[in-house]
Amino acid sequence: MIQQQTLLKVADNSGAKEIMCIRVLGGSKRKFGNIGDVIVASVKSATPGGVVKKGEVVKAVIVRSVRGLRRADGSYIKFDENAAVIIKDDKQPRGTRIFGPVARELRDNEFNKILSLAPEVL
């Protein structure tokens, strides 16, 4: 469950290390986001020479959540950390590599490029 002010790790090589959620997209009163949701975030820490810089406002998709997600078969999937991948406006990732596992539910929201770059899809 991601809301405003939540800190997330960045699971790609775009240059950002940590981002803070500013807004969960998808409705005017939307408070919480989960795996597969797009958020607007601010870069809180970044590596030197990266594509994105500290203080930049970016869009990102949530790929891992501590709260987890209930699947249609009744099972749950949970992760140890909250993580996101920085994306462009056309839902393509800004980085060229994805680190760590991602949830299969990203396929429903047409993030197929992220799924193909990920080392493991759960």
Curated annotation (Swiss-Prot):
Protein's name in the database? Large ribosomal subunit protein uL14
Instruction: Write down any Gene Ontology CC term.
Output: cytosolic large ribosomal subunit
The family this protein is said to belong to: Belongs to the universal ribosomal protein uL14 family.
> Which is an annotated GO molecular function term of this record?
structural constituent of ribosome
Key word rRNA-binding present: yes
The protein's role, per its UniProt record: Binds to 23S rRNA. Forms part of two intersubunit bridges in the 70S ribosome.
GO annotation (BP), single: translation
Give the signal peptide range.
Answer: none
Keywords attached to this Swiss-Prot or TrEMBL record, sorted alphabetically, are:
Ribonucleoprotein, Ribosomal protein, RNA-binding, rRNA-binding
Q: How does it assemble?
A: Part of the 50S ribosomal subunit. Forms a cluster with proteins L3 and L19. In the 70S ribosome, L14 and L19 interact and together make contacts with the 16S rRNA in bridges B5 and B8.
Query: Which SUPFAM superfamilies does the UniProt entry name for this protein?
Result: Ribosomal protein L14 (SSF50193)
Keyword RNA-binding applies: yes
What InterPro entries does this protein's entry cite?
Ribosomal_uL14, Ribosomal_uL14_bac-type, Ribosomal_uL14_CS, Ribosomal_uL14_sf
**What species was this sequence derived from?**
Clostridium perfringens (strain 13 / Type A)
